[in-house]
Curated annotation (Swiss-Prot):
GO cellular component, one term: cytosol
Source taxon at top rank: Eukaryota
Gene3D superfamilies: 2.60.40.790
One of the GO biological process terms: determination of adult lifespan
GO molecular function: unfolded protein binding
Pfam families according to UniProt: HSP20
UniProt gene name: sip-1
Protein's name according to its UniProt entry: Stress-induced protein 1
PANTHER family the UniProt entry points to: HEAT SHOCK PROTEIN HSP-12.2-RELATED, STRESS-INDUCED PROTEIN 1
Domain sHSP: 33-141
PROSITE patterns: SHSP (PS01031)
UniProt lineage: Eukaryota, Metazoa, Ecdysozoa, Nematoda, Chromadorea
Family: Belongs to the small heat shock protein (HSP20) family.
Amino acid sequence: MSSLCPYTGRPTGLFRDFEDMMPYWAQRHSMLNNFNNIVPQQLNEVENTAQKFCVKLDVAAFKPEELKVNLEGHVLTIEGHHEVKTEHGFSKRSFTRQFTLPKDVDLAHIHTVINKEGQMTIDAPKTGSNTTVRALPIHTSAGHAVTQKPSSTTTTGKH
């Protein structure tokens, strides 16, 4: 007896439409392959040295008036909000980045600048005070303390 629906080697029904579209998805110049051109990647660079703490961000997709930089305690928050409305619709874009500043940053002298390429740089000089580090014993469940080899007791720029 022959089958009314011969086996074709691929599923039938619901998934057939998706399989028929597969050649279009695989095209080299499809919209999905150009996604990085549509939504730019933000550059995020953090530098923490003995002299300063520095954050660099690519904010070229935002106007300066669409950006906010706030400092609450030692938490630095950078926000951007962009909105475009036309008769055909609207688009919104936003981001938020937070950084916890080291304890030895001079909070009164933080400087923010945006260059003509849209790169935001936030420089926070450090006060130069050293942080003392002391080794703590590690206790095992048996009650023994493991002592560490002594190391330098003063560090700068390590957090």
